[in-house]
Amino acid sequence: MLPTNMATNMTDMGTLTEISDYPWRWRRDYLMLVAAVAVSEEELHPDEMELLKRWVEQFRLPPKSREAVFAVLKNKPLDRPRIERRLSRTDLVYSLMLDLMGMAMADGILMDKEIHFLRGIAENLEIDPIDFNILIEFIHSAHQAAQMDNPEPLYEHNIESAFQLMLKRNVRLFPHTLLCVSSPEYDLQLKERWMRFVARNNNR
């Protein structure tokens, strides 16, 4: 449940809310999980490190919370299930999963091992398995569509399905969230498309 000051200042779903408006403990836990995904493979890719550093700045964490996030990269013991259960009680669940998938995709490849790792997190966050699959297909499709002048109908279908899910689950996108990590231009297009999608459905 959101703190009173957060609940009263919520903007429309079609806008991009600032993550820094949320309690710092939520933001710390959020980025600790992102860091865990970044090091879920044997080697931390430079693009993953760059993305994590950028997000740490955008999340405006207190100094000790920043240290806690970067400590995860050094394989400091992390009670991940406990953190996931805490975050499962917030409204950040689906936004977090999008960012976790974005981090996993930061090196340009989403490996089966990473998908398995993400699925385990999704279970503790109490994300429906069908919803998880829709988001995975969305991440794949956005990456592929960004490389085409005329995206295939299947990719368009997967993007539309994800938008419908996000609307149904009241997902709020943040400016830092990358809907397409491989292309800043297409990422912006998707965010604009999302806002039009929300506006169109709100007017029905």
Predicted regions located by residue number:
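Small-residue-enriched hydrophobic alpha-helices in membranes
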Residues: 2-38, 43-204
